[in-house]
Regions:
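Thiol/disulfide oxidoreductase modules built on the thioredoxin-like
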Residues: 63-71, 85-92
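N-terminal leader/targeting and pre-domain segments
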Residues: 1-17, 106-121
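Local sequence-structure signature of Cys/Sec-based thiol-disulfide redox active-site neighborhoods
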Residues: 1, 8-46
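Extracytoplasmic/secreted envelope proteins and their assembly/folding machinery
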Residues: 10, 37-41, 60, 94, ...
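Non-catalytic, surface beta->alpha helical segment in thiol-disulfide oxidoreductase systems
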Residues: 78-137
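Thiol-based oxidoreductase modules, predominantly thioredoxin-like and allied folds used
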Residues: 5-6, 23-26, 44, 48-63, ...
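Extracytoplasmic/periplasmic, Sec-exported soluble proteins
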Residues: 28-35, 55, 66, 89
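Acidic, Ser/Thr-rich peripheral helices and adjacent loops at domain boundaries
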Residues: 71-79
Length: 137
């Protein structure tokens, strides 16, 4: 079961690199931002995603556009539609980043509903699927 989850998560994230990008908002002197940058470099090397680092003080309008007030903050953006979703505020581990991206990609692609946020694809229609027991289907 764990192997299926990991494979599904990695395939989804890898497939998202052409559709999505990450923006990390930082500030000069932010030690947590430096820690997050190291984690993002590992993520970039593993998945090949585009990641842009934005200094909030230098680009306050961009921070305001995404309603960012703290650093580090990571936002996922759909390169085609421009829609975005917050991924983290503060430092997030590589495993938590991967899980959050997996869920966010599926949600933004319309593959899951908010009720199915905590599910993996192979669980759809089974006992863990909250929509299996509702009229929402």
């Amino acid at each position: 079961m764990v192997a299926i989850r990991v494979r599904e998560q990695e395939e989804t994230i890898a497939s998202g690199r052409n559709q999505f990008a990450l923006i990390m908002f930082t500030r000069p002197g932010c030690e947590f931002c430096e820690s997050q940058q190291s984690i993002l470099e590992f993520f970039i090397n593993k998945y090949g995603w585009p990641v842009r680092t934005v200094d909030m003080d230098e680009y306050p309008n961009m921070a305001a556009k995404f309603d960012v007030t703290m650093t580090p903050t990571i936002i996922m953006v759909d390169k085609n539609s421009g829609k975005s979703m917050p991924i983290s505020i503060g430092v997030i581990s590589m495993s938590d980043l991967a899980l959050k991206l997996y869920r966010s990609i599926r949600y933004m692609r319309g593959e899951i509903t908010p009720q199915q946020w905590f599910m993996h694809d192979f669980e759809k229609g089974k006992s863990n699927d909250p929509l299996k027991y509702t009229e929402i289907q």
